[in-house]
Amino acid sequence: MNIPIYQVPSVTMQSLHQQSLYQQTYLDRNRMVTDVFVQEHVSQSSWSMAGSSAVFIPGPIITGSAHGHCHHTATVSTVSPQLATFMPFPGMQYYAASSATMNAYGHNQMYSTRASASVGFYLPQYHASCSHEQPKKTFCAAQTQTQQTAKTSCDVGTQVDLDAEELRSEARKPRPESVVPEESSISSLESGAGDGFRVQKKLRNSEVKLLDQRLHDITRVSLHGSEIAERLANAHRNRPCFKKIDTLCARLKQDLLRPDGVLPNINSQGIAWAVKDFIFVFTRIVNAWVILKGYVYNTPDALNKIKDELPSGFMASFDSWQISTLSIVKMIVKSFVNLDELLQKQKNSFSGKDGAPINQSNSISLRSFIDSNDSSGLAQKYLGMTTGHGPSAFSTPNNQIRNNAASKGQEPTSSALYKPKCALNLNYLYTMIEDSEETQRHVDANGTYLKTGTYQPLQKESMQLEMPPAKPNDHYVERNANQQALPSQEIPNAPTPKSSPQSDRPRDVRSYTNPFSAIGKEVTRQLYEFSDRVMELKNLERFFKKQFTRNYYPNFYQHCQDDFIDVRAIILRCENSSYHHIYQAIHDLRRIIFTVRCYLQMYTDENLLYYIDLYERSVNDMLSKPPHYPNQFDHIMGRPGEKLFNYEI
């Protein structure tokens, strides 16, 4: 038996940790991912051999092909006696992982693409079906590596590991070779969002919870950008194009920091506020896109210089934002249409069954317009609008008249169709679009809402007919006209029992005075000048409006809110000439001081005491300067019912 026997010293050998890496590039939906690796892990084990043991080598070991069987040749090569030839266990497992899992496992288990390309290793080729038999040796296992669960792939959009079955199901999905450009943009958006769109289709909007971290990140970045923009706007404030930009940045910062006011506005204004908000957001988003696309899509040399100064990756970020904007704009348009349909249902329940067919036809026309907008071109949309089949203006009175005429078989003329009706036609649309702080809104049958505040209650028609009694006035006038011939009888008949018409007459002195007289003009001028001086006062912000007073001093407001009027109301009365004399305006200014002093006699509030001293000092300084005389108004203390005029006429 020609088997060579070699004597080797006692050694402790450990199997080599053989790793084979190769890079695989695959297409994850629409993204090119180059971070997938397949590793061959060989189980680590160590064994100890007895001293002066013989190593039997049946022949030279020839490494076979990675994809073929091992074959031995008849030629026996000479083996160097200084080297011990061995073959470790061919146990191997295949792993595929994304960049996230590689970084989690560490550099000992995973290698990046660049490192594997630059570092050279020895990569022996093995095949598990070789016929070599391990010599029978006495060994003991010292350490074994616990193999982890094999992971096949990872979705880079959601960082969720996918099993083999999910990969097969994804591979079986039909992928159209040619799609419409609009659909391709949406598909790329869905692929970039990972499994978010598939989950969203199964859940309602109220059941989807977004990450709070994104909210904090956007707020942090926006605040930082607002500060930088405000500094730049202040630096360039003398340029005409920077007019009011600093105010816009400051208001944006306030909007980011103050609490969300959507729920209070919905509670006070109703669903119309939500419709207005979505229309407002739609216009702002599209306006932002209009500004940016002027810089992106134009290619003159001057704009190219500007685009080169933009940060690297701006064009790619704009393109991805443009794709997502296309989707969100469509969603917003459908959102305020759906909200308007909900508003129409509430109006139908408010107005009764008569207005239901009209509102239903308007909502159907809106829905058909959106569907035609998704499927047809611009020519069809303009054709539908010019022929009268386009969208209606959200159930305006003009559309109700038009629908009633169509139901009766009467076709309105073109002049009647396109003739503007001013505020009558656009009242409801303006109610949704304009801000509630800028427009006075009243309740009517169209479903408009009241702005938050205090208003006179609406009176029914029957009450309005009963309040002005016309017959007693006529009888009173006729009887006085008949008794003019007897002047001696006028004195005993003066206190007539029917004196109710006298109480209904207005008690305002302005109705009995001539506003164009010299006295009336002088009083009006003094009140206007006094209101301007009050506006220039300092330390009156906390009493400028009762809402501010309630925020700063809630206990004082709770006890004394009905005992004084705020500074804003005093200024408005001066501008409207509601005061008969300037003394009344001064009395109301000092009425605030008197009310606070009375409150501080019973309660303790150091902040209120300090601020009322500042307020009183400002008022006294104003009243002691020209055109007023010193100590001219010291007799006016602000007490209820005090005598304002210290002289007799």
UniProtKB/Swiss-Prot annotation:
Keywords: Cell cycle, Cell division, Differentiation, Meiosis, Spermatogenesis. It comes from the Eukaryota. The keyword Cell division applies. Residues 393-414, 485-503 have a biased composition (Polar residues). Transmembrane segments: none annotated. Residues 167-193, 389-414, 485-512 are annotated as: Disordered. Disruption phenotype: Mutants are viable and females are fully fertile. Males show premature mitochondrial aggregation and fusion in spermatocytes and spermatids, leading to an aberrant mitochondrial shell around premeiotic nuclei. Improper mitochondrial localization occurs in the testis associated with defective central astral spindles and a lack of contractile rings which leads to meiotic cytokinesis failure. Residues 177-191 have a biased composition (Low complexity). GO terms for biological process: cell differentiation; cell division; meiotic cell cycle; spermatogenesis. Residues 167-176 have a biased composition (Basic and acidic residues). Required for male meiotic cytokinesis through its involvement in the regulation of mitochondrial aggregation and fusion, astral spindle assembly and contractile ring formation. This is Protein mitoshell. It comes from Drosophila melanogaster (Fruit fly).
